[in-house]
UniProtKB/Swiss-Prot annotation:
<keyword id="KW-0805">Transcription regulation</keyword>
<dbReference type="Pfam" id="PF00356">
    <property type="entry name" value="LacI"/>
</dbReference>
<dbReference type="InterPro" id="IPR000843">
    <property type="entry name" value="HTH_LacI"/>
</dbReference>
<comment type="function">
    <text>Probable regulatory protein for the binding-protein-dependent transport system for alpha-glucosides such as sucrose, maltose and trehalose.</text>
</comment>
<feature type="DNA-binding region" description="H-T-H motif">
    <location>
        <begin position="5"/>
        <end position="24"/>
    </location>
</feature>
<dbReference type="Pfam" id="PF13377">
    <property type="entry name" value="Peripla_BP_3"/>
</dbReference>
<dbReference type="InterPro" id="IPR046335">
    <property type="entry name" value="LacI/GalR-like_sensor"/>
</dbReference>
<dbReference type="GO" id="GO:0000976">
    <property type="term" value="F:transcription cis-regulatory region binding"/>
</dbReference>
<feature type="region of interest" description="Disordered">
    <location>
        <begin position="337"/>
        <end position="356"/>
    </location>
</feature>
<dbReference type="InterPro" id="IPR010982">
    <property type="entry name" value="Lambda_DNA-bd_dom_sf"/>
</dbReference>
<feature type="domain" description="HTH lacI-type">
    <location>
        <begin position="1"/>
        <end position="57"/>
    </location>
</feature>
<dbReference type="InterPro" id="IPR028082">
    <property type="entry name" value="Peripla_BP_I"/>
</dbReference>
<keyword id="KW-0804">Transcription</keyword>
<keyword id="KW-0238">DNA-binding</keyword>
<protein>
    <recommendedName>
        <fullName>HTH-type transcriptional regulator AglR</fullName>
    </recommendedName>
</protein>
<dbReference type="GO" id="GO:0003700">
    <property type="term" value="F:DNA-binding transcription factor activity"/>
</dbReference>
Length: 356
């Protein structure tokens, strides 16, 4: 049975006030004492009385999320995986989410209401766009926040956790180029989101280093579903000069692309190579595809947990985190990538000389 505050204090040989201040992040409690208290909390299963803490500290012990309701976002399994990481960390620290659905055009007003309500101590934002106005707005509201991703243009002095998307797709494209591929297709996420912009940039950079250009006809942007991956791949394969390799911004897109490739009677890794970005979705493991996928790997759940840890640490004055974190994706080579196939035309037969 979990202990109460008095029992926890007696166990530690500290006053209830000291234990309470350690739990609430007061700076006058030294690091050693705070560490002892937190360790005892983990061992005993102690849960603080949040109602009493709110009265004592003025904190809500809640993280705010403005939930986008634009088409294709609310049902996105990638967003769900990110939220799962956030939720796991929040539960660990007995924090809550305050979810506020909002259409894109109402987002600013929703954030303002959330900040004014006092129901949250901090917020996070995701689905970053170029020159994203939300960063300056949150700064003006003076509410703590962390960004999942980065904007392009605008201010640079804001806290974020992001994946090096340019570097990830540069590495992937360079591998394909080293294998002899020069017609590389891209099945990407929504065109206006910065992770998609940066992934395309990585591919363009790798091609340019070898004097090659990206064929715009071999690029498709969409919501990241298997059906969109299927349709995009079908379209590419019907072209007069189809790609010999394809980059997919998600294993979900790759699932559809693989279906189209199989229906066309092509062999993955031989007739066409495929690399996908792996967000480490538990229900879709790249090694379990019929042909194991080469991937760039970075966990969405880990990113969600990290952002929650940073927000909670800031609220409780615990932990020392870098302002900006750019994670490198790991390139994992499997069987879906191989040398470019020889698609050169057959030579014309030599004319016969003379006759019988």
């Amino acid at each position: 049975m979990p202990v109460n505050l008095k029992q926890l204090a007696e166990l530690l040989g500290l006053s209830q006030t000291t234990v309470s201040r350690a739990l609430n992040g007061y700076p006058e409690v030294n690091a050693e004492t705070r560490a002892r208290v937190l360790e005892a909390v983990r061992e005993t299963g102690y849960r603080p009385n949040r109602a009493a803490q709110r009265l004592a500290t003025g904190k809500a012990y809640s993280i705010g999320l403005v939930m986008p309701i634009a088409a294709g976002i609310d049902s996105d399994i990638h967003f769900g995986e990110f939220l799962a990481g956030l939720a796991e960390e929040a539960v660990e620290h007995d924090f809550h989410f305050v979810l506020n659905p909002s259409a894109p055009e109402d987002e600013e007003a929703t954030f303002r209401r959330l900040a004014a309500s006092g129901n949250v101590d901090a917020v996070f934002i995701a689905y970053m766009r170029a020159n994203d106005p939300r960063i300056e707005m949150l700064k003006a509201l003076s509410i703590p926040f962390v960004v999942h991703g980065r904007s392009i243009g605008g201010p640079r002095d804001y806290p974020f956790v992001d994946v090096d998307n340019t570097g990830a797709f540069y590495d992937a494209a360079r591998l394909l180029i080293q294998l002899g591929h020069n017609r590389i297709a891209l099945i990407n996420g929504p065109e206006h989101l910065t992770f998609s912009i940066r992934r395309r940039k990585g591919l363009v950079r790798a091609l340019a280093e070898k004097g090659l250009n990206l064929d715009d006809a071999l690029v498709h942007h969409s919501a990241m579903t298997d059906e969109h991956g299927y349709r995009s791949m079908q379209r590419f394969l019907k072209r007069p000069a189809p790609p010999t390799a394809v980059l997919c911004s998600s294993t979900v897109l790759a699932l559809g692309a693989v279906r189209a490739i199989n229906q066309a009677g092509l062999a993955i890794g031989t007739d066409i190579s495929l690399i996908a970005h792996d967000d480490v979705l538990p229900m879709l493991k790249p090694e379990n595809f019929s042909v194991p996928l080469t991937t760039t790997r970075s966990s969405l759940r880990a990113a969600g947990a990290r952002i929650a840890k940073r927000l909670i640490g800031g609220i409780l004055n615990q932990g020392d985190y870098p302002e900006q974190e750019l994670w490198r994706a790991e390139l994992i080579v499997r069987a879906s990538t191989g040398p470019a196939p020889d698609r050169s035309p057959l030579p014309n037969p030599s004319p016969q000389v003379g006759g019988a």
